[in-house]
Amino acid sequence: MRIGSLFSGYGGLDMACQQYFGGELAWYSEIEPAACKILAAHNPGVPNLGDITKVNWAEVEPVDILTGGYPCQPFSQAGQRKGKEDERHLWPFVAVAIDALRPRIVVLENVRGHLTLGFGDVIAELSRMGYDARWGVVRASDAGAPHGRARIFIVAYLAGERLARDAAL
């Protein structure tokens, strides 16, 4: 399975998807210099599409799985929670990518505060595009991290594409 990654960061979400679903990273989209350097070192030959707001998705090879940890600042309890009014509100660009690429599976990650601001819009947009979504909150400490920050994970499947082994998701 081919995996595409938006807002890749240091690649943790991509690695988790590779381990769970199988497959290889086909491309990623990241602009932070330090993260780009690490991603390039760990994924030689895998192209970086750069700034998601400038990508022409009609020119990008489709993938089976699309991952994305889009910016949390618009939704975070630690910030001003401006939602759609925040210049870092980039969910609409993720939606454009999903609609153009039509991956079988979409895996998204964000802060728990997103549940009370903007989350309904994300789920409604996924549904409009023909995806069935499941979500849950996981504390970082549940995965062995030394802190308990909670993150929301959304797994969305194109209608009819859900894998039998993923019935618990």
What residue spans do the PLM features occupy?
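A generic structural signal for ordered secondary structure
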Residues: S8, D14, P47-L49, G118, ...
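Hydrophobic/aromatic anchor residues within beta-strands of the central parallel beta-sheet
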Residues: A26, P47-N48, V106
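Class I S-adenosyl-L-methionine
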Residues: V55-I65, Y70-L169
